UniProtKB/Swiss-Prot annotation:
The lineage of its organism: Eukaryota, Metazoa, Ecdysozoa, Arthropoda, Hexapoda. This is Protein-S-isoprenylcysteine O-methyltransferase. The gene is ICMT. Its EC number is 2.1.1.100. Belongs to the class VI-like SAM-binding methyltransferase superfamily. Isoprenylcysteine carboxyl methyltransferase family. One of its GO terms (biological process) is methylation. It is a multi-pass membrane protein. Pfam families: ICMT (PF04140).
Length: 281
């Protein structure tokens, strides 16, 4: 059963997506290609959505609804850019849609498995300064290279490989969340709850940390989509270092929770990320 917050997010995400899709189709049909006009259309649509949701929802529900609606807008806008933009800009549209789907599906997955803990943080849109800096850096690289080397951003077969990597990573991560159910949490837990059990079946029989494996490859895939030769290795290294530390801390907690049971699990199943061993006793 989807929580009330999950239902609000789903209504806002799908509603915003569908309405903006209709607007984009009208826009395409009438051949409106002026950048200023299109920017104003997006701006006025966003403003109208803001006040519409503000009128109907209380503070907490509005905070969820506006984020979900924004992600729905970004999803469709990305698809529209992918369809009508110049060849060297089209891949950025695909990237926008991938980002929107990832962040919305993060919230929806938590709303399903942890309905009592869901919050605006569950969108993981701005969960750390490092994440924001990394995202902005990739945008800066993309547009600088688009300006000076437009042909680089027209290698669509390579960008499509990145899209496939993102899809596989996304599916793996969300499968891991749904498999773990109430045992999954965005934050490393320092105390074992009474209903916390060690999950070792499904994708957890493949990797000890399938949600991290999915996110690791998804993050690299986003930069392959953008064909960012600088950010691809930078994201790979930064993500690897982040998950190395995260897994080390998390496994120290899991060993204290489950003892020999987790130790045996470590012996049987790897972390899933190359050269990361985790916490060993």
């Amino acid at each position: 059963m989807l929580s009330p917050a999950g239902k609000i997010s789903l209504q806002s995400f799908t509603g915003s997506s569908l309405v903006f899709f209709v607007i984009c189709m009208f826009n395409h049909y009438y051949g409106i290609t002026n950048l200023v006009v299109n920017t104003l259309i997006v701006f006025f649509y966003a403003v109208n959505v803001y006040f519409f949701l503000k009128f109907f929802y209380n503070e907490f529900a509005f905070a969820i609804a506006i984020r979900a609606a924004f992600l729905g807008l970004v999803l469709v806008l990305g698809l529209y850019i992918k369809l009508v933009a110049p060849p060297n800009i089209q891949i950025f549209g695909g990237y926008m849609s991938v980002m929107a789907l990832f962040h919305y599906s993060e919230f929806l997955a938590i709303a399903i498995v942890q309905p009592k803990q869901v919050s605006t943080d569950s969108f993981v849109i701005n969960h750390s300064p490092q994440y924001t800096i990394a995202a902005v850096s990739s945008w800066v690289e993309f547009f600088i290279e688009t300006y000076f080397f437009p042909g680089l951003k027209e290698i669509h077969w390579l960008s499509n490989i990145g899209l496939c990597v993102c899809i596989l990573g996304e599916v793996l991560r969300k499968t891991a969340i749904l498999t773990a159910g109430s045992n999954f949490n965005h934050l490393v837990q320092c105390e074992k709850s009474s209903d916390h059990v060690l999950v070792t079946h499904g994708v957890y029989a493949w990797f000890r940390h399938p949600s991290y494996v999915g996110w690791f490859y998804w993050s690299i895939g986003t930069q392959i989509i953008l064909i960012n030769p600088l950010c691809i290795p930078a994201y790979t290294l930064a993500s690897w270092m982040f998950f190395k530390e995260r897994i080390y801390i998390e496994e120290s907690m899991l060993l204290s929770f489950f003892g020999q049971q987790y130790c045996d699990y470590q012996q049987q199943v790897g972390t899933g990320i190359p050269f990361i061993e985790g916490y060993k006793i």
